[in-house]
Amino acid sequence: MTIDHDAVSKILKIGVPAGLQGMVFSLANVCIQSGINSFGAGGIAGSAVELNYEYFAYYLVNAFAQTVVTFTGQNYGAKDEERCKKIFRLGMLCSVISCGILSTIFVVFRTFFIGLFTSDPSVYHYAQLRFLIVLTFECLTSSYEISGGCLRGFGRSMTPAILTVFGSWVLRLIWLATVCNWFHDYELLMAIYPISWVLTGTMVLVAYFRTRKKLFL
C-alpha cells in the first residue's frame, strides 16, 4: 500500500484554501472584538448574547455550502452543466430562505431571546443593536458561501479563499482603522458585517459565473 500522491495533491489543493478562509474569518473577528471591547462590559456581553443566535443562522448557510461542494464536484466530473446550474440555484435558494426565516424569527422576537441571557439594560441595548444590524442581514452570507462552495466543487478552491481574505479581513481592518477610529460608534462597528458580506458576495458570485462559463464552453 502506497500513498496516492495525485489524490493527496488534489485534496490539499481544495482543503488548504478552504481552511485558510475559515482562519481568516477568525482573525477578522478577533480584530472586530478588539473594537467591541472598547464599549465596555455591556458591549462585550451584548455582542456575545447575539452571537449565540447568529451561529444558528450561519450554520444553516454553511450546511448548504458544504452540500453544494459535494454535488457540484460529482456533476462537474460528469460534465453535466445543467445539474451544476441547478445545484447552485437550489443551494442558494434553500440557504437564503432557511437562514432568512430563522434570522427573522430571532430579530422579531429579540426581546424574548435576549431575555433568556440577561435583564441588564446596557447588555440588552448592545445585543439588540447587533440583532438589528447583523442578524437581520445574515442571509447575505449565502452569496459567497454557496458560490464559493460551487467553485470548490469545480476544483477552484483558491479563488473564493483569496476573495474572502480581501472582503472579510482586509476591508474590515481598513474599516476599523479609519471609520471606527474616527467615530466611536457601536452601530458603525457592526455595519462592517453586512457591508463586507455584500462586497465579498459580489466578488465571489462574479468569479463563480465567469468560471462556470469558461469550464462549460
Spans of features found by a protein language model:
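Short alpha-helical transmembrane segments in multi-pass integral membrane proteins
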Residues: 1-16, 72-137, 179-217
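C-terminal structured "cap/appendage" subdomains that terminate the fold
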Residues: 147-173, 177-184, 189-191
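Alpha-helical transmembrane segments of multipass membrane proteins
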Residues: 30-34, 56, 104, 146-150, ...
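Juxtamembrane/interfacial segments around transmembrane helices
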Residues: 28-29, 67-68, 143-148, 187, ...
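Hydrophobic faces of transmembrane alpha-helices in multi-pass small-molecule transporters and flippases
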Residues: 3-31, 36, 52, 56-60, ...
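Helix-terminus/linker motif at the lipid-water interface of multi-pass membrane proteins
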Residues: 23-50, 56, 74, 112-121, ...
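Small-residue-rich hydrophobic transmembrane alpha-helices
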Residues: 46-110, 141-164
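Transmembrane alpha-helical core positions of polytopic small-molecule transporters
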Residues: 25-26, 62, 141-142, 169-172
